[in-house]
């Protein structure tokens, strides 16, 4: 079992980051890979959850222990797997999630990708009172310089597709941001706010 890994951040993709330590490159699935953009080629520490499956060993990474705790609570709910849990973390700053659980707001929970009514109701039942000791989770890191506007928007769309959002939803988002200049991380944050409305 791993608690965290320290290493050099060598790669960022739409679905995962690669952390090199001890001559090995670890593929780590994270909620918003582009939130690590300002740390590329730097030594970082990332909190880890290790999942062993028959066909694979998977690593899930988090900025903070609280973010990891939210993930572990989410995957304890029947119907929520690691990918859905990462999508929820990416789309929410924890405040909305906690309020929705506390107020049994099933409609809010159903806005997350791949969360239907039954799973949303299960979340309310299983997660009530579980977030009391967890601080606000935010993947908000310092801004990075823009490489290329189209490339940044393209990367953001790829990351949102990886989180389970549908292509037709994302076409509207792409059109909305057409002609703007921002980082992939900021595009993702803005798009997630729009998708959660």
UniProtKB/Swiss-Prot annotation:
One of its GO terms (molecular function) is four-way junction DNA binding. It is found in: Cytoplasm. The keyword Iron does not apply. Residues 64-142 are annotated as: Domain II. It comes from the Bacteria. Residues 143-147 are annotated as: Flexible linker. One of its GO terms (biological process) is DNA recombination. Disulfide bonds: none annotated. One of its GO terms (cellular component) is cytoplasm. Keywords: Cytoplasm, DNA damage, DNA recombination, DNA repair, DNA-binding. Its main location: cytoplasm. Residues 148-197 are annotated as: Domain III. Residues 1-63 are annotated as: Domain I. InterPro entries: DNA_helicase_Holl-junc_RuvA_I, Hlx-hairpin-Hlx_DNA-bd_motif, NA-bd_OB-fold, RuvA, RuvA_2-like, RuvA_C, RuvA_C_sf. The keyword DNA repair applies. Homotetramer. Forms an RuvA(8)-RuvB(12)-Holliday junction (HJ) complex. HJ DNA is sandwiched between 2 RuvA tetramers; dsDNA enters through RuvA and exits via RuvB. An RuvB hexamer assembles on each DNA strand where it exits the tetramer. Each RuvB hexamer is contacted by two RuvA subunits (via domain III) on 2 adjacent RuvB subunits; this complex drives branch migration. In the full resolvosome a probable DNA-RuvA(4)-RuvB(12)-RuvC(2) complex forms which resolves the HJ. Belongs to the RuvA family. Has three domains with a flexible linker between the domains II and III and assumes an 'L' shape. Domain III is highly mobile and contacts RuvB. The RuvA-RuvB-RuvC complex processes Holliday junction (HJ) DNA during genetic recombination and DNA repair, while the RuvA-RuvB complex plays an important role in the rescue of blocked DNA replication forks via replication fork reversal (RFR). RuvA specifically binds to HJ cruciform DNA, conferring on it an open structure. The RuvB hexamer acts as an ATP-dependent pump, pulling dsDNA into and through the RuvAB complex. HJ branch migration allows RuvC to scan DNA until it finds its consensus sequence, where it cleaves and resolves the cruciform DNA. This is Holliday junction branch migration complex subunit RuvA. It comes from Streptococcus mutans serotype c (strain ATCC 700610 / UA159). The gene is ruvA.
């Amino acid at each position: 079992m791993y608690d965290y890994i320290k290493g050099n951040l060598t790669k960022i993709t739409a679905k995962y980051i690669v952390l090199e330590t001890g001559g090995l490159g670890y593929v780590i699935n994270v909620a918003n890979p582009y939130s690590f953009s300002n740390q590329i080629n730097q030594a970082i520490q990332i909190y880890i959850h290790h999942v062993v499956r028959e066909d694979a060993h998977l690593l899930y990474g988090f900025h903070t222990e609280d973010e990891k705790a939210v993930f572990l609570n989410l995957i304890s709910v029947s119907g929520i797997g690691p990918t859905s849990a990462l999508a929820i973390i990416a789309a929410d700053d924890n405040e909305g999630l906690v309020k929705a659980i506390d107020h049994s707001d099933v409609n809010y929970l159903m806005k997350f990708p791949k969360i239907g009514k039954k799973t949303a109701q299960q979340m309310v039942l299983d997660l009530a009172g579980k977030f009391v000791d967890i601080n606000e989770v935010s993947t908000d890191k310092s801004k990075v310089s823009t490489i290329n506007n189209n490339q940044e928007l393209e990367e953001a769309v790829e990351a949102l597709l990886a989180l389970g959002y549908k292509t037709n939803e994302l076409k509207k988002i792409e059109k909305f941001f057409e002609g703007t200049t921002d980082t992939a991380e900021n595009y993702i944050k803005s798009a997630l706010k729009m998708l959660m409305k």
